[in-house]
């Protein structure tokens, strides 16, 4: 160290003054400490293999990096960021040869590599909890395939459905959200190393080698693109925001259902009032719902930071990264909680079935039955609307018969078998009749659950394979490092 606490590296220019703390990112850099060590090790191994630096210098640097790791992030010397602080620690330990660590490299490609390295791990964690939520929804669907409940549009009773059909609706959206996260992961898992500041390097580096040592799928081809672009952050945060928006709808439904007595939220995921001891509040799902605002806010903040930036590197990018961490942490936590709520919720079948018949919610099914008997659907619609108007709730066979005769001039039996209308008036019968693909009938639900579980199995297998691939790369890097130290 030099007098006054200046870092060893880059100490000759612009090292002091009030801007020092403003420029520093050390407060948030603990998150990428391990990533930077891995990136440093892969870079040093590659430099030695390419004869850019000697084996002795490589061994000394790698040994110093091991000491830095053992001491931990909090033991780092002062620095503008974790990258500079680690290099300073290496130079202090090794001497001048420690400065060879940064050969053929800029902080620009180094920082980008560290962000990608850490973000990909976070994305895998996010994918894992989203798949777990889908699995919980599939389990609910399988268990509640015949549990009839009211379905709503505009929060008004619309048509009878089932708990299973409701659960599967979210499982489907979350499957697409999983795909978006996987797409973001694929474009995150590319190496920018070797780009240097933005225009490459005169040294004979092997970009593919460092990419392989770090488990990246390949390299970002153009050096300026590799060093300067943060579109992978925007894609990841956008995918996370989509997950959060999906879960906000799920959470809103659970809060609404709890208010109506349609679902029993486990005590583990509820709270009571500080003054009203009888209260059981679904607070966790209210916070899950609010997470969408945080995630979309991070998305907007990130996009605003990135818009209009000229090529190649701009310090604005330092402020961009935190928005990604905010989104991935908040969304992952919220999805994990949502999965727990879904997995432990109780569904009171008798109460749900009774509520399913309220508000003449079987009206559409009755109109369908009349249309199946030969009435034009619009005429059938008029009949049922009149039955609802005359009968208030309207859910009686007599009301439908009277309305049919009033509109058509014929008795109900001349249009359709009254038994068909009676079945359509019954919430259970109404659900059973809607057996088209994707519908709520038990047979349709059974097929849908099988498809959903096939998708879950495929995504779980892909996730396990990707984690194994990264673990293999980490083992391979450790083996290469052990050849020097």
From Swiss-Prot:
Biological process, per Gene Ontology: arginine biosynthetic process via ornithine; L-arginine biosynthetic process
Compartment(s) of residence: Cytoplasm
Intrachain disulfide bonds: none
Pathway(s) it belongs to: Amino-acid biosynthesis; L-arginine biosynthesis; L-arginine from L-ornithine and carbamoyl phosphate: step 3/3
Keywords carried by this UniProt record: Amino-acid biosynthesis, Arginine biosynthesis, Cytoplasm, Lyase
GO terms for cellular component: cytosol
EC number: 4.3.2.1
GO molecular function, a single term: argininosuccinate lyase activity
Pfam family, one: Lyase_1
InterPro entries named among the record's database cross-references: Arg_succ_lyase_C, Argininosuccinate_lyase, Fumarase/histidase_N, Fumarate_lyase_fam, Fumarate_lyase_N, L-Aspartase-like
Catalytic activity of the protein: 2-(N(omega)-L-arginino)succinate = fumarate + L-arginine
EC class of the enzyme, as a word: lyase
UniProt similarity note: Belongs to the lyase 1 family. Argininosuccinate lyase subfamily.
UniProt xrefs under NCBIfam families: argH (TIGR00838)
Protein name per the record: Argininosuccinate lyase
Organism: Halobacterium salinarum (strain ATCC 700922 / JCM 11081 / NRC-1)
